[in-house]
A protein has these predicted regions:
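Mature catalytic core of soluble alpha/beta enzymes
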Residues: 2-6, 12-15, 19-410
């Protein structure tokens, strides 16, 4: 039997999410498809003298490392002067990669000064950019582009990273009734929610024609040879719905290898939180109101430690036409935007899993979606369905505080 709870409104509190400079705010992370903001201790990090803390300057994409993976260098430990009076400082990196905003934050410790944290963050960013070059469809020489170019032909040899993401994609497709299908790229251009945004609605004829090239079962993987093959000419894959979660986990691994014990890594709506705040308390994640006024408008919070989050929502890449909302989460079984939910926030042990299942849960709807998430170890979900009801998976209930109903609007 599916374990679920329908949560009604609670009015026992509210979250302050001011961006004003220097103003103290709660330790809260906004989780949404929009870029997230980590409010760990104050709205803007400052040093003990009150001066704003400069962000890490990241290299441009042209300075990304080679595609050849290698072990992260050992941590650089530099004992701080006056450790007895040590006060942690927030260090932040913000850059663009994988078509979204990358944010990495951590605190200085007596063993890891600001320079060491900056070096670790830049190494983590470089790892994300290395993976981007392998899995993007914007480069003809990426492994994903080479698989697409060879559709209907011979298998394509790929590296272990891309193979791992493809393998997980097929695993989720099978468990989600095909609602997560990376061969959905065949519909590219019909719906335009990104760079070339348009409110033009494709015809049913065009949708049906494109859907003939969508079938995850025609992607063949050979683990021994480490190859991938699309079985029909004209088929295409896109890893945009899962690769960012994998990249977040790999970046987190780099930070851990550099000696960081408390940090967060965010790529768009995918987030991993490691450790606790300097005061020993857990961080909190804010769950965005899908019809809220801005991306820091929350209706619930979740305590988090050593876990990841990923959100799928109908409110970012979307448009409203003739009173109806159209958004980028397309049901591959119909070719039309899924209509069962407004938002899904997935909690999991790693970002790879969270990113892999949030869209599937969104498309399946609350009952089947909760059944899916409960079937996966150490995973949970908060769902706002199309009628604005809030559903919380049994495993996640003890960690969630819903303090008001989400806004009810189209």
């Amino acid at each position: 039997m599916i374990e679920r709870r329908e949560t009604r409104a609670k009015t026992d509190g509210a979250v302050s999410a001011s961006r004003s400079r220097g103003r103290r705010a709660r330790a809260l992370t906004a989780i949404s498809l929009a870029p997230l903001t980590w409010l760990a201790a104050c709205a803007e990090p400052r040093d003990p003298g009150g001066q704003p803390l400069a962000e890490v300057k990241a290299p441009t994409a042209t300075h990304a490392p080679s595609a050849k993976p290698g072990p992260a260098p050992p941590p650089t430990l530099r004992p701080s002067v006056g450790a007895a009076a040590f006060e942690p400082r927030l260090v932040r990196l913000e850059e663009g990669a994988m078509g979204t905003r990358i944010v990495i934050q951590s605190f200085t410790t007596p063993e890891l000064e600001e320079a060491s944290l900056k070096g670790a963050m830049l190494a983590a960013l470089e790892e994300i950019r290395r993976l981007e070059r392998l899995m993007t469809t914007w480069r003809d020489d990426s492994e994903v582009s080479r698989i697409n170019a060879a559709a209907g032909g011979e298998p394509v040899a790929i590296g272990p990273d891309t193979f791992a993401v493809l393998e997980k994609s097929l695993w989720i497709a099978e468990r989600s009734e095909g609602t997560f299908d990376i061969s959905f790229e065949a519909m590219k251009g019909l719906w335009r929610f990104d760079e070339e945004k348009s409110d033009a609605i494709p015809s049913q004829k065009d949708i049906d024609q494109a859907r003939k090239k969508i079938d995850w079962r025609k992607l063949s993987l050979d683990r021994e040879a480490r190859t991938a093959k699309l079985g029909e000419a004209g088929m295409r894959i896109n890893l945009g719905g899962i690769a960012k979660g994998y990249a977040v986990d790999r970046a987190a691994a780099v930070l851990e290898q550099r000696g960081l014990a408390a940090f967060y890594v965010q790529a768009g709506g995918d987030l991993y939180v490691r450790g606790k705040k300097p005061d020993g308390k857990r961080f909190k994640v804010g769950v965005r109101d899908p019809r809220g006024k801005h991306d820091l408008d929350y209706f619930a919070t979740i305590e988090v430690e050593d876990h990841a989050f990923s959100t799928a929502g109908d409110y970012e890449r979307s448009f409203i036409k003739d009173g109806k909302r159209y958004h980028h989460i397309i049901d591959p079984r119909t070719g039309w935007p899924a209509s069962a939910c407004r938002s899904v926030t997935v909690w999991a042990k790693d970002a790879f899993m969270a990113d892999a299942i949030d869209d599937a849960i969104f498309i399946l709807g609350p009952e089947k979606g909760l059944a899916l998430v409960e079937s996966i170890d150490d995973a949970g979900a908060v769902i706002v369905d199309a009628s604005n009801k809030v559903w919380i998976s049994k495993r996640l209930e003890p960690h969630v505080h819903v303090f008001r109903r989400p806004t009810d609007a189209p």
